[in-house]
Amino acid sequence: MKVLFIAGFGPIATDVEQSRRLYEEALGITFKKEDGDYRHTEELKGANTFAVWPLEQAAESCFGGAEWPDDVVRPQAWLEFDVDDVAEATREMEERGYKLLVSNRTEPWGQVVSRLVSPEGLLVGLTMTPWMRPGEHDVGA
């Protein structure tokens, strides 16, 4: 597996309003708001994307419902690595014994993703993010 870049990172919020006050009001970060309370920016130098991802939306992405299962460590943050080949990266992680929550799924917005919870409690994605790869088509799909 070859990691190409960090596609994005940020907190997973259980109290979106408190997170909004910290990041928008106190730190002055301007976010775009989409899909309910999902807030993101591609304008912070040094990051492709920084986003506050509501836990309910992370649960929907991983499990198909708004509730995070009690038997899976609840993540505090998310981190996505764009890789050269998501299918191969997924296979490698499974061979190493990692339990994937999502395998090789294409999200409604076009990103291909496999996800797992890291030992530190991060929701880690192995991704192919088309809009971050100008000139490339169907990479990792």
Task: List the model feature ranges, each with a label.
Residues L4, G10-Q57:
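Core segments of cupin and vicinal oxygen chelate
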Residues Q57-S61, M132-G135:
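A short local loop/turn or secondary-structure capping micro-motif enriched for an aromatic residue
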Residues Y38-R39, P108-W109, E136:
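Positions that flank functional sites
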Residues F50-W53, R115, V124-T127:
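Conserved beta-strand in the GNAT
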Residues A59-R74:
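Aromatic- and Gly/Pro-rich amphipathic surface segment
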Residues A13-E17, V72-L123:
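Vicinal oxygen chelate
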Residues M1-R20, K33, Q76-F81, T127-A141:
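N-terminal beta-strand motif that seeds the catalytic metal site of vicinal oxygen chelate
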